[in-house]
């Protein structure tokens, strides 16, 4: 069901639209958690470190696709708010072929550079065998990731956040069942975990594509387009590429830090692999809320509903900050039990390192919550370049401080953990300051 976010209660509209997105991303995290949990319990610390490092790499690679889809989705929302059906159809067509081409290119590059990644990420010898086996399979799922994210972005842009949730729920269940069968039953090792994830990704991608083709008139009407204007492709690419750059820079910084983490050995690698899953799971709802907020702002920006934009911003800040405060308290208190979900209780060194990470990051979730709102705001107001600037500041600070602080013997790996919230807070300060200085021009 499509939801017109330019009408009705501001807070209620955002929350009802955001809840399926949050639930959907919870299920998306189940892909990764299923791999990590089963691998950690049944295949050992080296396999856990391999899958954890692979997850960071895959996040970087798929961020290219995700960024392009998010950028296109923002334009779709603006067209929907403007009631420009023909323009929406042209944007869908132009973005689909552009992102499909980028996906094919990304897949080729990933396979060609597979062995080079070992040097860049400083992967230890005892981990590389499992990591290579996992990556060589998981790369096959990149086209499935494209299909799901493209059509999910389109459906959400017109206010339908429920259908992406349904397809993701089905694929999440399939992923977990296949994980158990391939790893425990068939003894296929880390390759089996990758195979389970790839099958689930194609199931969700093909399923949602078929649904959109059958049920959405905007997608079906693409067949009536006589030609595709190059200026439309240029507009899509100029906007989506900036969003893509923002996502890629963000995850490149994370990938660079992963290489630094790997240099501290298998114990820290395994701790980081488990803790980063918990960390992402904890703040993921505010990330999804930021994306839902972005769609709300974009539709109202297209409809020139300035009052709803400002009301929505105030409401979103209150909701996001309240949630972050609660989650920060829970993660701080339950950090150790959360680590034992992924790591055997006897692995005390791994658990201690993970608890340290979680308590430092978790204390500053309000910082990342604010940053996600800023990303969504500037994307919706057709200022994706500002999102790139904020990302460069956040990740640049994180990477620079991580290397500087961790090189001090008295600080060590703790310096990597502290670099993250410092980067969040600096980016927040700039993003909020820019909006306050330019709000009359941004939302006239």
Regions found by a protein language model. Name each.
Residues 1-18, 76-141, 185-241, 297-364, ...:
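Short alpha-helical transmembrane segments in multi-pass integral membrane proteins
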Residues 16-35, 137, 148, 171, ...:
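Transmembrane helical elements of multi-pass membrane transporters/channels
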Residues 21, 25, 37, 74, ...:
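Transmembrane alpha-helix boundary and packing residues in multipass membrane permease domains
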Residues 22, 26, 30, 34, ...:
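Generic alpha-helical transmembrane segments of integral inner-membrane proteins
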Residues 26, 30-49, 118-125, 181-188, ...:
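Helix-terminus/linker motif at the lipid-water interface of multi-pass membrane proteins
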Residues 45-56, 135, 194, 266-281, ...:
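Small-residue hotspots at the loop-to-helix junctions and early N-terminal turns
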Residues 48-108, 145-164, 271-335, 368-390:
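Small-residue-rich hydrophobic transmembrane alpha-helices
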Residues 69, 137-156, 164-172, 193-208, ...:
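Short runs within selected transmembrane alpha-helices of multi-pass transporters and secretion channels
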């Amino acid at each position: 069901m499509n939801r017109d976010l330019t009408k009705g209660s501001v807070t209620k509209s955002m929350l009802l639209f955001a809840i399926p997105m949050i639930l959907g991303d919870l299920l998306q995290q189940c892909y990764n958690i299923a791999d990590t949990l089963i691998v950690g319990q049944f295949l050992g610390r080296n396999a856990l470190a391999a899958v954890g490092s692979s997850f960071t790499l895959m996040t970087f690679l798929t961020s290219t696709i995700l960024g392009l889809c998010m950028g296109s989705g923002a334009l779709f929302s603006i067209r929907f708010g403007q009631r420009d059906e023909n323009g929406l159809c042209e944007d869908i067509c132009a973005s689909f072929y552009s992102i499909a081409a980028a996906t094919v290119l990304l897949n080729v590059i990933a396979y060609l550079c597979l062995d080079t990644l070992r040097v860049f990420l400083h992967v230890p010898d005892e981990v590389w065998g499992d990591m290579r086996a996992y990556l060589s399979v998981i790369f096959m799922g990149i086209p499935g990731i494209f299909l799901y994210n493209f059509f999910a972005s389109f459906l959400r842009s017109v206010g339908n956040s429920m259908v992406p949730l349904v397809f993701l729920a089905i694929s999440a269940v399939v992923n977990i069942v296949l994980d158990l069968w391939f790893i425990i039953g068939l003894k296929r090792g880390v390759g089996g975990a990758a195979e389970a994830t790839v099958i689930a990704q194609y199931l969700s991608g093909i399923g949602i594509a078929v649904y959109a083709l059958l049920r959405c008139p905007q997608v079906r009407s693409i067949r009536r387009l006589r030609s595709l204007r190059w200026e439309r492709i240029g507009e899509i690419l100029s906007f989506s590429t900036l969003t893509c750059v923002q996502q890629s820079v963000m995850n490149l910084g994370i990938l660079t830090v992963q290489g630094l983490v790997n240099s501290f050995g298998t114990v820290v690698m395994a701790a980081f692999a488990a803790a980063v899953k918990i960390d992402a799971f904890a703040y993921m709802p505010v990330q999804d809320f930021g994306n839902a907020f972005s769609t709300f702002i974009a539709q109202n920006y297209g409809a020139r509903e300035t009052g709803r934009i400002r009301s929505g911003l105030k409401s979103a800040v209150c909701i996001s900050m309240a949630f972050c405060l609660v989650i920060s308290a829970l993660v701080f208190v339950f950090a150790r039990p959360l680590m034992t979900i992924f790591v055997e209780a006897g692995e005390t060194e791994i658990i201690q390192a993970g608890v340290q990470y979680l308590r430092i990051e978790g204390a500053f979730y309000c910082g990342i919550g604010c940053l996600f709102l800023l990303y969504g705001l500037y994307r919706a107001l057709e200022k994706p370049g500002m999102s790139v600037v904020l990302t460069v500041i956040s990740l640049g600070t994180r990477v620079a401080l991580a290397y500087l602080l961790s090189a001090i013997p008295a600080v060590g790996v703790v310096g990597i953990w502290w670099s993250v919230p410092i980067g969040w807070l600096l980016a927040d300060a700039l993003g909020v300051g820019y909006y306050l200085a330019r709000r009359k021009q941004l939302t006239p």
